[in-house]
Amino acid sequence: MKLLHSDISTNLIIHNDLEYYVKSGYGGKDIKKWPFYKFIKIGIKENYELAHSLWVNWLVDEFFKYCLEAKSKGGMYQGSVHRFAIEHVKKNKHECWLNPSLLNRTNVKLGASVLVNRHIKLIHSIINKGYQINMDDPIMAVKTKDTYVLKGGHHRAAVVYILGYEKLPGVIVYSKPLWECRKWLIKIKKYLR
């Protein structure tokens, strides 16, 4: 299992290049251009309350732009903000789950706040204990010619970069063809269930 993991240079990491991440301006970009990089940096260097507020507001705006778009394309349909927002809905949960544009801004803001609080807890954990490889939630990347396109673990990557780590440890690295094969196997597995 150890052979599958690599320590990759934080300077060679770019964000997942899915359609709606690209439309938002950070898909396929290096760490310093990710919106949440800025929020994490504000939190670590200055003020967690300000970072929390900016991050939540950004997530709410992104949600209303991309709430009907599939997560597989970088959208937010049935993603974390959506899921946490539903927890605050009193009536019509099922309808709001199927059509997130029915959610009001207050519930989406509460859902986004839950997610940001989890990210801030992650930040504190990395600061206090150092970065820990999580086998239950591995970070995966696709190796291109001279970069690594992260397919998950973006917040962890941003934190270690801000803290000065030169490498992000324990990343499962795929070639592009192997990643595409993996995606198809997952689709087939879902279909067979």
Language-model features, listed with the residues they occupy:
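Histidine (H) residue identity feature
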Residues: H5, H15, H52, H82, ...
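Generic serine detector
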Residues: S6-S9, S24, S53, S72, ...
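Extended, charge-rich helix/loop segments that form flexible
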Residues: I44-L103, V108
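A short, basic-hydrophobic beta/loop patch
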Residues: K2-K65, N134-K187
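Short alpha-helix boundary/capping and kink motifs at helix termini
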Residues: E87-K151
